[in-house]
Amino acid sequence: MNYEIVVGLEVHCQLNTESKAFCGCSAKFGKPANTNVCPVCLALPGALPVLNARVVEDAVKLGLATNCTIARHSILARKNYFYPDLPKGYQISQYEEPICSEGVIHIDLEEGGKDVRLVRIHIEEDAGKSIHDIGDDTYIDVNRCGVPLLEIVSYPDMRTPKEASAYLQKLRQIVRYLGISDGNMEEGSLRCDANVSVRPVGATEYGTRTEIKNMNSFRNVERAIEYEAKRHIEVIEGGGTIVQETRLWDADKLETRSMRGKEHAHDYRYFPDPDLVPVLVDDGMIRRMQEELPEFPEDRAARFVSEFGIPAYDAGVITVDRELADYFESTVKVSGDAKASSNWVMGEVMRTLKEKYLDIHKFAISPERLGGLIKLINAGAISNTIAKQVFEIMQQDEATAEAIVEREGLAQVSDRGAIEAAIREILEANQKQLEQYRSGKTQLFGFFVGQCMQKMKGKANPKMVNDILRSMLDA
């Protein structure tokens, strides 16, 4: 029997607000344990929460970006459960009345596009963190308590692990473009739980699902879903029954293991939080958030193609990341050459970012300096080969490309006499290859070009070398 995988994702997106969701403590990651805390975080008697307005604005922005219905009136609720790193014994969340509902995210796949529907987006606060790797004891860090989250819940519309990964990547792209989160899975600012089930192809009823946690990369999301789906099929075909439960993904063993029975909503005893007033969103806020929405990747890529004349592929690669697209556009303003700018950004810049594990905002070469380097190439002042040397120097040196070229003596040689003299020496030193070339082995032309460029330390004008060499070889 052939089976179909059914996947829905619950994604927690940590917002990059300065302060927490319900108090004035810093929400920044990486501070010493238990330093970003106050009576509200610690649930001390009499401490009352106050909702951070920025959290509501970010939720509305994400709702607008994903074509959700924005609730004019929504309720904050208490989600009750016990865990050592949850001082209050409940988490402030939303249940019956979320701030956003019924949205859609479009994903691009090799076989075409697909829409994944959203059930809801709701506001939530994060819990603390239990630390188990210090000696034999368990420690609690409550810095993370109260850090604002948005939970994005999809319908079970995905049918393959790759679709789930593509959806998650698109969601990360959206929150990054909006500027509401860095979407860093490794640091936990984007966390994903997958609900997985299988059913016979053609069936309309859903199978029993399991929830998978502890997936900290897109690759692990794919692997975990693939493993869990295969496990379901093996259990069913072996005559067993799938138990609805929560399972942990073990990235070292590449398998899931049982964690606990899957909770239902009634297990959390949700009820409206009496300490917090309803969340009200008016038309003015929606208009203001709409005006603050950025130009999204698809629109920006289309503009790059029409305005700059670069290929659609280049535009698609560059606009994956908002900051990279900003970098490219700033480079074009200086260089005046969009295609050369896209080649450098997609080539040397992205290669360096990957090798050094950098984000573009930490890259040493500003778009203004890269644009200046491209202008030198186009002016014939340096060759592409020399430009790559200058590019490497610029990563360690704050000087402009022009200053580095002058200081290092890297200017391109366009002196016809000097190039002719170098070629003459090359031909005299390689008589055998010269005879072979003139006997019809014309592929040796590249050999002579390489020898000449090597002799002139890469500084010779490539076009002049080609033209002069061809005339001397054919003489």
Swiss-Prot record:
Report the enzyme's class at the first EC level: ligase
Query: In terms of domain of life, where is this protein from?
Result: Bacteria
Q: Name one GO biological process term.
A: glutaminyl-tRNAGln biosynthesis via transamidation
Query: What reaction gets catalysed by this protein?
Result: L-glutamyl-tRNA(Gln) + L-glutamine + ATP + H2O = L-glutaminyl-tRNA(Gln) + L-glutamate + ADP + phosphate + H(+); L-aspartyl-tRNA(Asn) + L-glutamine + ATP + H2O = L-asparaginyl-tRNA(Asn) + L-glutamate + ADP + phosphate + 2 H(+)
According to the UniProt entry, what is the EC number of this protein?
Answer: 6.3.5.-
UniProt cross-references to SUPFAM superfamilies, sorted A to Z: GatB/YqeY motif (SSF89095), Glutamine synthetase/guanido kinase (SSF55931)
Keywords of this entry: ATP-binding, Ligase, Nucleotide-binding, Protein biosynthesis
Q: Membrane spanning segments where?
A: none
- Supply the InterPro entries for this chain: Asn/Gln-tRNA_amidoTrfase_suB/E, Asn/Gln-tRNA_Trfase_suB/E_cat, Asn/Gln_amidotransferase, Asn/Gln_tRNA_amidoTrase-B-like, GatB, GatB_C_1, GatB_Yqey_C_2, Gln-tRNA_amidoTrfase_suB_CS
Q: Which Pfam families match?
A: GatB_N (PF02934), GatB_Yqey (PF02637)
Q: Kindly list any coiled-coil regions of this protein.
A: none
Q: Which GO terms describe its molecular function?
A: asparaginyl-tRNA synthase (glutamine-hydrolyzing) activity; ATP binding; glutaminyl-tRNA synthase (glutamine-hydrolyzing) activity
Sorted alphabetically, which PANTHER family does this protein's record hold?
Answer: GLUTAMYL-TRNA GLN AMIDOTRANSFERASE SUBUNIT B MITOCHONDRIAL AND PROKARYOTIC PET112-RELATED, GLUTAMYL-TRNA(GLN) AMIDOTRANSFERASE SUBUNIT B, MITOCHONDRIAL
Concerning HAMAP family, the annotation shows: GatB
Quaternary context: Heterotrimer of A, B and C subunits.
> Which purpose does this protein serve, as stated in its record?
Allows the formation of correctly charged Asn-tRNA(Asn) or Gln-tRNA(Gln) through the transamidation of misacylated Asp-tRNA(Asn) or Glu-tRNA(Gln) in organisms which lack either or both of asparaginyl-tRNA or glutaminyl-tRNA synthetases. The reaction takes place in the presence of glutamine and ATP through an activated phospho-Asp-tRNA(Asn) or phospho-Glu-tRNA(Gln).
Family the UniProt entry places it in: Belongs to the GatB/GatE family. GatB subfamily.
Protein name per its UniProtKB record: Aspartyl/glutamyl-tRNA(Asn/Gln) amidotransferase subunit B
From which source organism is this entry?
A: Chlorobaculum tepidum (strain ATCC 49652 / DSM 12025 / NBRC 103806 / TLS) (Chlorobium tepidum)
